[in-house]
Amino acid sequence: MGNSYGLWPLVVINSLIFIIFAFSFTKPKTSWDWRSFGAFSAFLVALFTEMYGFPLTIYLFSGWLSAKFPGIDLFSHNSGHLFEDLFGWGGDPHFGPFHILSYIFVGYGFILLSNAWKVLYAARRDNTLATSGPYAKIRHPQYVGFILIMFGFLLQWPTILTLAMFPLLVWMYVRLARSEEENAQKEFGGEWDAYVKQTPAFIPKLKPKIAN
């Protein structure tokens, strides 16, 4: 595999950088916070393990990939950007369409986490319901932020493990969101019910058309 893999210090460094970065935005406190953050951290470790440590996905599909792309060095680092290979991007994969899209999703996901945390922290401090900022558009921007980041990394470097983990983590976040909503309803009652009627859970509403 040459010098492209077996770079375990990079696995550790990159995992820590993104985990600490996410931690600085989310600052988990409740058990729900820690569960969502722990699952997200596991996804990042699995991702960077294949990106820099051992390319399990490429190894398992090496026969098929070699037949389909006979001129590609499968175990070079650039070949790990599988979507760029599969869709015939001939240039540097770091500037390919999927990689650029991944930057957008990952970047926006972290911005959403940061903005959501500021509102949520203030609401918890004052024992009020978070309804401003990102919470004015959707009820669970923190989970949407995690999902956007994971989806962005999947576009950049898809692996068997992360592709399998992604739907499970989305399902877990939906369950955590429902548990949080049950507690919020008990705590805030009618205020929460009114908020739910006006604000979707995960996907923001399109702006209504202005009548003539």
What are the residue ranges of the model-derived segments?
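Membrane-anchoring alpha-helices and their flanking helix-loop junctions
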Residues: M1-T131, I149-N183, E187-N212
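Short alpha-helical H-box segment flanking the phosphoacceptor histidine in two-component systems
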Residues: P134
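Histidine-centered phosphotransfer motif of kinases
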Residues: K137-V144
